[in-house]
């Protein structure tokens, strides 16, 4: 598929210039069927440096020229987020669930205070979590929680356990008192 081939090429350019570049296919939920190209950096300085280098890369210029002549999809973003809890693993997780909450700025501290308890619950099912917030994006009152799984089977088993777990249900209730769940999605690593 032309779009997948182009995304992989773009990701390769970004990785050559220092990004930990990952491509996900959104399998269900918000934006199902779309692709998500994600680049991770250790600092904003590293991200800025990579952005400048990749923007000057002839391969990326060629790719955008090909796209202009024969579009194969729409590009949105880039948005920039910062990790506020739970560092992403060096090896990307094959399956992710992302949940986006609208959280007024005055309630961010209380929402983040629940992250260690959420992490402890998911460690019991051999999963990890991460929380990011926007630095440059359309909505600065969003908080995204990512649940990481080793496989589709692992995700199913973990979710079976969590939906029956009263401590998890209590956390979800509290989260919905502090913010409003606006979106959720399931993604697979390409």
Show which residues each predicted segment covers:
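Short S/T/G/P-rich N-terminal loop/turn motif that feeds into the first structured element of a domain
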Residues: 1-190
């Amino acid at each position: 598929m032309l779009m997948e081939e182009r995304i992989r090429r773009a990701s390769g350019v970004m990785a050559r210039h220092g990004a930990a570049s990952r491509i996900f296919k959104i399998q269900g939920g918000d934006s199902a069927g779309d692709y998500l190209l994600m680049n991770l950096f250790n600092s904003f300085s590293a991200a800025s440096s990579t952005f400048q280098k990749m923007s000057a890369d002839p391969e990326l210029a060629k790719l955008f020229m090909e796209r202009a002549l024969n579009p194969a999809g729409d590009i949105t973003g880039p948005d920039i987020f910062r990790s506020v809890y739970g560092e992403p693993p060096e090896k990307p997780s094959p399956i992710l669930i992302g949940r986006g909450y609208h959280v007024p700025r005055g309630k961010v501290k209380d929402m983040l205070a629940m992250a260690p308890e959420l992490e402890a619950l998911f460690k019991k099912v051999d999963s990890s979590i991460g929380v990011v917030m926007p630095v440059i994006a359309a909505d600065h009152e969003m908080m995204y929680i990512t649940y990481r799984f080793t496989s589709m089977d692992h995700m199913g088993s973990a979710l079976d356990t969590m939906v029956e777990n009263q401590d998890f249900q209590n956390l979800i209730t509290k989260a919905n008192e502090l913010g409003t769940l606006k979106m959720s999605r399931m993604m697979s690593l390409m």
